[in-house]
Amino acid sequence: MPRIIGIDIPAKKKLKISLTYIYGIGSARSDEIIKKLKLDPEARASELTEEEVGRLNSLLQSEYTVEGDLRRRVQSDIKRLIAIHSYRGQRHRLSLPVRGQRTKTNSRTRKGKRKTVAGKKK
C-alpha cells in the first residue's frame, strides 16, 4: 500500500481510483493530477516508483488543500456562518437542512431519530 500524504491508498486498484481515497480528491481532480504528473492512469497504485510517490506527495502538499487542512477549513467556514448569524449558520446550529430542502416530511438524516410527541387527548 503506497502512503501518500499520510494516507494508505489501496495498492491493487488503478491509480485514478486509488487517489480518490484521499479526502478532497474526487474523480475529476484525480484525472487532473495524473495528467499533470504524466502518470499512467491505468497503472495500479502498487506499480508507482518511489520517485513518482515523492512527486505526488510534493504536488498535493503544494497545490491542493486535502485531508486535515480541508476538514479544518470546512469546519471553520461553518463556525463562521454560525458566528455571523447568517441563515445558513442558523440552519447548521439547529441541525436542519441548509440548502432549502423541505422539512415537513423527510430530512430525517439531518434531524436525527424521531422524537415522539404524545397525541391529543379526546
UniProtKB/Swiss-Prot annotation:
A GO molecular-function descriptor: structural constituent of ribosome
Biological processes annotated in GO: translation
Keywords: Ribonucleoprotein, Ribosomal protein, RNA-binding, rRNA-binding, tRNA-binding
Sequence segments annotated as region (Disordered): 93-122
Disulfide bonds: none
PROSITE patterns (alphabetical): RIBOSOMAL_S13_1 (PS00646), RIBOSOMAL_S13_2 (PS50159)
Basic residues bias (residue ranges): 101-122
Any Gene Ontology CC annotation: cytosol
Pfam families per record: Ribosomal_S13
Function according to Swiss-Prot or TrEMBL: Located at the top of the head of the 30S subunit, it contacts several helices of the 16S rRNA. In the 70S ribosome it contacts the 23S rRNA (bridge B1a) and protein L5 of the 50S subunit (bridge B1b), connecting the 2 subunits; these bridges are implicated in subunit movement. Contacts the tRNAs in the A and P-sites.
Subunit structure: Part of the 30S ribosomal subunit. Forms a loose heterodimer with protein S19. Forms two bridges to the 50S subunit in the 70S ribosome.
Database matches in PANTHER family: 30S RIBOSOMAL PROTEIN S13/40S RIBOSOMAL PROTEIN S18, SMALL RIBOSOMAL SUBUNIT PROTEIN US13M
Protein family according to the UniProt entry: Belongs to the universal ribosomal protein uS13 family.
Protein name: Small ribosomal subunit protein uS13
Organism per entry: Chlamydia pneumoniae
Gene behind this protein: rpsM
